[in-house]
Amino acid sequence: MKKIMIISSTKTGYGHQSIANALKEQLTQYQDVTVDIVDGFLFAGRLGVKASGIYGPITRWGEQLWKLNWDITVKNTEPSIQMISMFTHDRFMQRLKNDPPNLIISVHPFFNTSMINILRDHNIKIPYITLLADLVDIHPIWVDKRADCILCPTDESMNACLSFGTDRSILRRCGFPIRRIFTEAARQTEHKLYNGERSLECLLMSGGEGSGNLKVIANLLLKNFNANVTVICGRNLRMKAMLEKQLSRYGNRICILGFCTNMHNYMMKADVTIMRGSPNSMLEAVTCNTPLIITGSLPGQEASNLEYAEKYGLAATCSNLKQLVPLMKTLLDNNAAGLNEIIKKQKAYRSFDSASEIAKFLIDHVLETPPNIPDFEYRYPLYMQAVELYRKLETSTSRKRKRH
């Protein structure tokens, strides 16, 4: 059995995990292949898990703090890499020793150089491939020139890698992997054009973490248009409760939801989707062929996504919400000609087969035989012993609770 490890993250937005799932769906179609999606932050223990949990609150309430972090680390990645290498070494090596993979794929930037350092330090010959999860603005921590391959979902991301001095021979242009649930829905159902003869179905999203001006946008749409609005709040339960209370006067014209696993249904139904410029959600919507209005983006890795969407005609952009109503009226003029033009451009852009094509490429790089993992010494043996003791105590306590 050939084993593939995908290094992802469960708490830094949902995009990385969605990409990992899209790859796993395709890779497991191959005979004698198993795929394990691993949260890379777990290799750093509880500290790593807690650190990854900060992403949601920061992107929700502290975008400028996130921008400051980007600006500092983009100039010097070495301190971050050294810290990650230090905290991940023992658990990563333990995982390799216990369950060695025939291929490692990373869809998260934080771990690439640290993991490759560890593989090199122990002379472990496991192919390591990075799949970029961003479209235009690529943080240098994504790019380690020693990787066997770096998969670039756009021309812009490939150019960014080249600007870091990466050898073109290890770069490969690919599409953006989208989960099968979206591609199959789009294959089977043609998105209906809107002609103004019924209520406008609007979908509001703000990423898996539920950040953004959802209340303001919902009010603008419901006050100014014959519209029904569905709001997806993601994991932000506080926002969901607040919107349910403050928008209740609109009755059945408003539907407020939390984190959804059936986003494709809402996208296929929507006449227009309004969202942040998150690459994963944006391209899932493009796959479903729902016209987009992008109202902003996270500083750093999403900064150029509005320009990217405009360049390829995938969306209208509105960074100032005072312009949202005029923009919407323009898109709805002449039997919604503006919305239908976006649909046309999206059809020309989208690809249903990117994930399967990437999987085919990855399968060609899987080792035929299990790699040799040498014996190693823990760099922090006392810490690992303490962790093991804590696990045993936790397990024992849990069993006692179940008995009672």
Tell what function each PLM region has:
Residues 21-97:
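Conserved N-terminal ligand/cofactor-binding loop architecture of enzyme catalytic domains
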Residues 336-404:
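C-terminal amphipathic helix plus adjacent low-complexity
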Residues 148-208, 234:
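A nucleotide-sugar donor-handling region in carbohydrate enzymes
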Residues 271, 289-291:
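A short alpha->beta transition loop at the rim of the catalytic pocket in nucleotide-sugar-dependent
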